[in-house]
Amino acid sequence: PTLITLYGMPSACGLKQLSPFVVKVEMALLYLGLEYEVEHISPLKVRSLSPAGKVPWIRMGKSTLSESDSIIAFLNGNQDGDLFDGLTNDQRVLGLALKRLTEDHLYWLMVWAKWISETSRAALAESLLDQYPRPIRMVISAVTKRQISAMCKTQGIGLMSADERGKEAVKDLTALSDQLEKMPFLLGPDITVYDFSVAAMLSSILFFKPTNWLSDMAKNHEVFPEYLGRVSDRLGDYEFIQD
């Protein structure tokens, strides 16, 4: 079989893989038992190297494919996998709703928490751009802050007060923790494709260093680290944390 190359961000700020969407695809690769290698791309090169201008993407032989959901669906179909089998219609509806909550709402709160705060952004710049002198890092950091702030304003999170963002985060985290307290995985006794989205995002929030207001909030939910432990075990001791 052709070796799959998964392209992602480097390790940074306590996380083995900075992008939760790359973590999500890596979990699918492990679940499906596929052979793969991870190629870490400098954030400054992602736009020019990636077919879609962002991570993740994969290469198999001469073909490339982008978008985490498209990659997972392709790998599952190619492998005759069971990632989408055995789910009831109600489970699919709930799984999709929680995936959207995580990837299209909580994600933006996480981006704001990591990139807008001075401490957090400085740690990211140092971690990701350590090969550049400090003045260049500071310029890139300031430009990145402006770009991310603009994206978050378009999305809506960036137009809220800190207090409003906090309330939104509480709602998202409580919804996830309420669901995860009912059963070992998101939808039942075993892992499903929706766990990859939720576990990837929660790990990216919880294990990020330095801590920020969102990671502090997430730590109030004891079920999150327990759940991530179960996901890791199920995928053969998957490591979320940077060595």
Report the location of each language-model feature.
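GST-like domain detector, emphasizing the conserved glutathione-binding G-site
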Residues: 1-138
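C-terminal helix/juxtamembrane-tail motif
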Residues: 230-243
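Acidic carboxylate-rich catalytic motifs and surrounding loops in phosphoryl-/glycosyl-chemistry enzymes
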Residues: 39-45, 189-191, 242-243
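Amphipathic alpha-helical segments that form well-ordered structural scaffolds
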Residues: 24, 28-31, 168-179, 230
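GST-like fold's C-terminal all-alpha helical module
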Residues: 108-217, 223
